[in-house]
Amino acid sequence: MRPSYFISDLHLSEKHPELTELLLRFLRSAAAGQARAVYILGDLFDFWVGDDEVSELNTSVAREIRKLSDKGVAVFFVRGNRDFLIGRDFCRQAGMTLLPDYSVLDLFGSNTLICHGDTLCTDDKAYLRFRRIVHCRRLQKLFLMLPLKWRTRLAAKIRRVSKMEKQVKPADIMDVNAAFTARQVRAFNAERLIHGHTHREHIHHENGFTRIVLGDWHNDYASILRVDGDGAVFVPPEEC
């Protein structure tokens, strides 16, 4: 059967065109074109202030994802902590199916739980409080009513504050909480978990299940996970 591919944490922006080029190369590759599905598990973009923002970056990415979708490859998207405001309009434009925070897939007979990963970092209490606020539907609606220029400035300010806070936070609280993660996997009756967010690419075998962490994309490196009947493996971009 055809494989599925998983990516996350590309953090695309105009400042890093090399990352956009890496993604476009992957989407145009023979491997992606022959896939059963491609799953984007959040933080496709470095920030997102609304589907009404039109830029060359957003348009080119949506165009290439749509081309892949038109070939018969199912493309699914889970919102991340940077692009949680991506809505149905952009997903429709790109030919992507928007998934909830948690979904369970039957991947070659293995029940697999997928998510972005930020909700698993339960030791970071300050972030979870912030997340609850920005995920309030009423506040999101009010934010999206602001002029685009204001939203962009506010998003930039929030990113600066977040970057400064990360520099002083203990590294362990920014990783997943092992006990909570194991409970989530059991609650969804899964035997494998795939997530991103922490940027700590690795395949863990723990607590009776497999936890696969997708890495972030940086410089000329793309973290791409291929899952097929033989299992799950990270593949370099040149093999795609």
Curated annotation (Swiss-Prot):
Major subcellular site: membrane
Binding sites annotated in the UniProt record for Mn(2+) 1: 9, 11, 43, 199
Cofactor binding summary note: Binds 2 Mn(2+) ions per subunit in a binuclear metal center.
Pathway: Glycolipid biosynthesis; lipid IV(A) biosynthesis; lipid IV(A) from (3R)-3-hydroxytetradecanoyl-[acyl-carrier-protein] and UDP-N-acetyl-alpha-D-glucosamine: step 4/6
One GO term describing the cellular component: extrinsic component of plasma membrane
Annotated catalysed reactions: UDP-2-N,3-O-bis[(3R)-3-hydroxytetradecanoyl]-alpha-D-glucosamine + H2O = 2-N,3-O-bis[(3R)-3-hydroxytetradecanoyl]-alpha-D-glucosaminyl 1-phosphate + UMP + 2 H(+)
Biological-process GO terms, alphabetical: lipid A biosynthetic process
Binding, substrate: 81-82, 124, 162, 166, 169, 197
SUPFAM superfamilies listed in its UniProt record: Metallo-dependent phosphatases
An example Gene Ontology molecular-function term: UDP-2,3-diacylglucosamine hydrolase activity
Binding site for Mn(2+) 2: 43, 81, 116, 197
Enzyme Commission number(s) from the entry: 3.6.1.54
Coiled-coil residues: none
Cofactor dependency: Mn(2+)
UniProt keyword annotations, A-Z: Cell inner membrane, Cell membrane, Hydrolase, Lipid A biosynthesis, Lipid biosynthesis, Lipid metabolism, Manganese, Membrane, Metal-binding
Cellular compartments annotated: Cell inner membrane
Topology versus the membrane: Peripheral membrane protein
Family per record: Belongs to the LpxH family.
Main function: Hydrolyzes the pyrophosphate bond of UDP-2,3-diacylglucosamine to yield 2,3-diacylglucosamine 1-phosphate (lipid X) and UMP by catalyzing the attack of water at the alpha-P atom. Involved in the biosynthesis of lipid A, a phosphorylated glycolipid that anchors the lipopolysaccharide to the outer membrane of the cell.
HAMAP family according to UniProt: LpxH
Protein name (database record): UDP-2,3-diacylglucosamine hydrolase
Organism from which the protein derives: Neisseria gonorrhoeae (strain ATCC 700825 / FA 1090)
Record lineage: Bacteria, Pseudomonadati, Pseudomonadota, Betaproteobacteria, Neisseriales
Gene that produces this protein: lpxH
